[in-house]
Amino acid sequence: MDLHLSNIGHRYGDTEVLRGIDLEITAGQIVCIIGPSGCGKSTLLRFVGGLERPDQGAVLQLGEPPADSLNPLTYIFQDFALLPWRTAAGNVSLVLEDHGIRGAEANAIIDDVLARTKLSDFRDALPKQLSGGMKQRVAIARALAVRPACLLMDEPLSALDSQTRDLLMDDLLELWLRERFTACYVTHNLAEAVRIGHKVVVLSRRPGRIRDVVDLDIPLERRKEHAEDLQEQQRHLWDLMREEALAADQELADV
């Protein structure tokens, strides 16, 4: 299932947040969205996920989600959103219970997604017994349990230390190489964007417009072999971001 964003625009009161956003999210690709603070990245993700409706334009789902998909569009947040009184397995089972799946069928799905996220040994652990990285793995496992057509990821690694963030990026890449999932990934971290994105969408200062779309042609499984190329792409992205930030500062100075 592909996603097509057509002429998305939105205001909150007198503040124009997004303007004229056209974007294709192709099945099997990770599309990263970056931009200055306040440019509308998370707002755009909420429109993709159907949590809000834009004032202008539309988000179209092209094609059908997988036949076994319980929820075509599924969120992963930066704050994990785990219930503290439920174990890792219990937090995953919550989304299955919402769809009436219990018993042996639920246990089979839970065992599968915990294994895929390297959490089999922590099935019965409570969130307070898990590190930040493990908590985010539980959140990823929970999202995978509903077999989504597209993962919507809102700065999922921003609450983690740099070492844990690197390990989680490796895990996400390994998972993608096995499953070829689709993701729309909002981040402020340029290193993340060039490490895991097939393309990077750069939004301008508010109102957020698409300043550039950078295609990263190096296969994900070979990114570590091309560190210098990725650093060059990261510098290019930073130059674009810096120009937008400086322009925003100048606009404030001129007021």
Which residues does each predicted region cover?
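Conserved ABC transporter NBD signature motif
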Residues: 57-68
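The feature captures the beta-strand-to-loop junction immediately N-terminal to the Walker
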Residues: 34-36
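A short, proline-enriched helix->beta-strand linker immediately N-terminal to the Walker B motif
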Residues: 145-149
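Conserved ABC ATPase "signature" region
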Residues: 104-122, 174
